[in-house]
């Protein structure tokens, strides 16, 4: 993927607030399940905006910075309920989204960004992104991409 969509911290906060508005009224929600790692920061922003205190994680491994790899569930979260919001940063090819839908069919599944191959899997999202565009999230960047201190072996 040669084209990139650069997301700044400011943009992410604005988009998360827009997503939170779509999730009102808040009394319909009991908690949030973040899809780790991409959904961690959007989940924190939504939890703040909606004043939700219960936040859990499902840990899914699918990317190595910009390379898709086999999906693995590292940790499950309890909570298949229509009162739970599942949050990820994006839906891309739909691999993770299909797993989320199968595990939590009653939950509300939301993302900030959606690409064409996966967007039918989410209930709400904010920004359409073309399939061949790579999204650079602010937690992955300094001035340029910074490798994590610890990498997969």
UniProtKB/Swiss-Prot annotation:
CDD domains: PRTases_typeI (cd06223)
Membrane in keyword set: yes
SUPFAM superfamilies recorded: PRTase-like
Residues annotated as binding 5-phospho-alpha-D-ribose 1-diphosphate: 37-38, 69, 88-96
Pfam families associated with the record: Pribosyltran (PF00156)
Binding site for xanthine: 92, 135
Pathway: Purine metabolism; GMP biosynthesis via salvage pathway; GMP from guanine: step 1/1; Purine metabolism; XMP biosynthesis via salvage pathway; XMP from xanthine: step 1/1
Catalyzed reaction equations: GMP + diphosphate = guanine + 5-phospho-alpha-D-ribose 1-diphosphate; XMP + diphosphate = xanthine + 5-phospho-alpha-D-ribose 1-diphosphate; IMP + diphosphate = hypoxanthine + 5-phospho-alpha-D-ribose 1-diphosphate
Subcellular localization, as worded in the UniProt entry: Cell membrane
Enzyme class: transferase
Cofactor: Mg(2+)
Binding site for guanine: 92, 135
Subunit and partners: Homotetramer.
Described purpose of this protein according to its UniProt entry: Purine salvage pathway enzyme that catalyzes the transfer of the ribosyl-5-phosphate group from 5-phospho-alpha-D-ribose 1-diphosphate (PRPP) to the N9 position of the 6-oxopurines guanine and xanthine to form the corresponding ribonucleotides GMP (guanosine 5'-monophosphate) and XMP (xanthosine 5'-monophosphate), with the release of PPi. To a lesser extent, also acts on hypoxanthine.
Entry protein name: Xanthine-guanine phosphoribosyltransferase
Protein source organism: Buchnera aphidicola subsp. Baizongia pistaciae (strain Bp)
Gene name of this polypeptide: gpt
């Amino acid at each position: 993927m040669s084209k990139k969509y650069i997301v700044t911290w400011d943009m992410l906060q604005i988009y998360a607030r827009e997503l939170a508005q779509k999730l009102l009224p808040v009394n319909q929600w009991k908690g949030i399940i973040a899809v780790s790692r991409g959904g961690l920061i959007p989940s924190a922003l939504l939890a703040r905006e909606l004043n939700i205190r219960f936040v859990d994680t499902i840990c899914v491994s699918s990317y190595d910075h910009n390379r898709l790899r086999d999906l693995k569930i590292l940790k499950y979260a309890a909570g298949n309920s229509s009162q739970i919001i599942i949050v990820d940063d994006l839906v891309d090819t739909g691999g993770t989204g299909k797993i989320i839908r199968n595990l939590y069919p009653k939950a509300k599944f939301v993302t900030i960004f959606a690409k064409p191959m996966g967007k039918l899997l989410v209930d709400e999202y904010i920004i359409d992104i073309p399939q061949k565009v790579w999204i650079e999230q602010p937690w992955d960047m300094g001035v340029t991409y910074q490798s994590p201190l610890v990498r997969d072996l």
